A protein has these predicted regions:
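Short-chain dehydrogenase/reductase
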Residues: 91, 139-147, 180-184, 209-210, ...
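Rossmann-fold cofactor-recognition segment
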Residues: 45-56
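NAD(P)H-binding glycine-rich loop region in Rossmannoid oxidoreductase-like domains
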Residues: 54-93
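NAD(P)-dependent short-chain dehydrogenase/reductase
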Residues: 128, 151-209, 213-217, 221, ...
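N-terminal Rossmann NAD(P)H-binding glycine-rich loop of SDR-like oxidoreductase domains
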Residues: 8-27
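Amphipathic terminal alpha-helices
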Residues: 2, 290-302
């Protein structure tokens, strides 16, 4: 019989970050339980997947009590960008789930390490570097939900002495990234030689903070193991990347001799995440970058 160091629950365990984190914990002898909406064909061998309704407090509570996890990472949030027709319902549902999770650990006084996820969209687009002391200024209703969730966590953290942190994540990609996002779309357009679609993206001259998802997940992993209990930490690349540089890199990598007209690099409003506190507190280092993620995406069948 295998001996495990600790037990961890990961919601949304079949998403990009859930898969990467599950692998990390399995490699380090953790017993991993994945709470999912439905069991997919692609899953990891050593993860115990449980179809779970996170909106049902009673059902959720019973499963958490039974497992008695040392760590709980909540990744299972609907992205309203893909559910525009159901945005209000989606955000209300997302908040109910967060509240259920926090309420369980508050009521039962369980000293589990809790990690919630935040977004760069919680901050104003000002072209500057965002740090943990920057005031929230939501860009959209999704960001408002994230801020509301963080504030509720903080309220309960102070009252019930929870070990809880909001990990604020900036853009990060890998081969597991949802194909509707920008970098996977670019890789797909290049592989399918859809240069008109590529040109449209090129002329938007987008820039922002982009990382390899494995780096971001390694930071979350280190946070999960840390004895420290910060209120929030930023996980980002700490630098600005221009999407046009990624496009040109992938075109060159694919031996496609096509050039779009050079454009002036405008002063874009997208902000950059200052990850210095996370690096210091967790001894976290970035070992990869977004170009490596893009290269990996172009090599797989999308």
């Amino acid at each position: 019989m295998k001996k495990y160091k600790k037990k961890i629950i990961i919601t949304g365990a079949l998403g990009q970050d859930g898969l990467i984190l599950s692998k990390l914990f399995i490699e380090n002898k953790f017993k991993v339980f994945g709470f999912v909406k439905k069991i997919k064909k692609y899953k990891l061998k050593n993860v115990k997947y449980l179809k779970t309704s996170l909106t049902n407090f009673s059902t959720l509570s019973k499963k958490i009590k039974y497992i008695n996890p040392d760590i709980f990472i909540h990744l299972g949030t609907d992205n309203p960008n893909f559910l525009e027709t159901k945005k209000k319902y989606s955000l209300k549902k997302n908040y109910k789930i967060i509240k259920n999770i926090i309420d369980f650990f508050s009521i039962n006084k369980v000293k589990t390490k809790i990690i919630l996820i935040g977004s760069s969209q919680m901050y104003k687009k000002n072209g500057l570097k965002i740090n943990v002391n920057t005031n929230f200024k939501p860009q959209n209703s999704y960001a408002k939900f994230r801020i509301k969730s963080h504030k509720y966590m903080m309220k309960c953290k102070k009252r019930f002495n929870l070990n809880a942190t909001t990990a604020i994540l900036f853009n990060h990609d890998s081969i597991f990234r949802n194909k509707k996002f920008l970098i996977p779309r670019i890789a797909k357009f290049i592989k399918q030689k859809k240069f008109n679609e590529l040109k449209k993206i090129f002329f938007e001259n987008i820039s922002g903070d982009f990382s390899h998802a494995e780096d971001i997940c390694k930071g979350i992993y280190k946070l999960a193991l840390s004895k420290k209990n910060p209120n929030k930490l930023i996980f980002s690349s700490n630098k600005r990347t221009f999407i046009n540089d990624i496009i040109n890199y992938l075109l060159n990598l694919s031996s496609i001799k096509i050039k779009f007209a050079k454009m002036k690099r405008k002063k874009y409003l997208s902000s950059i995440g200052n990850n210095s506190l996370a690096r210091k507190e967790l001894n976290w280092k970035l070992k990869k970058n977004i170009l490596i993620a893009a290269k990996e995406l172009i090599k797989i069948n999308i």
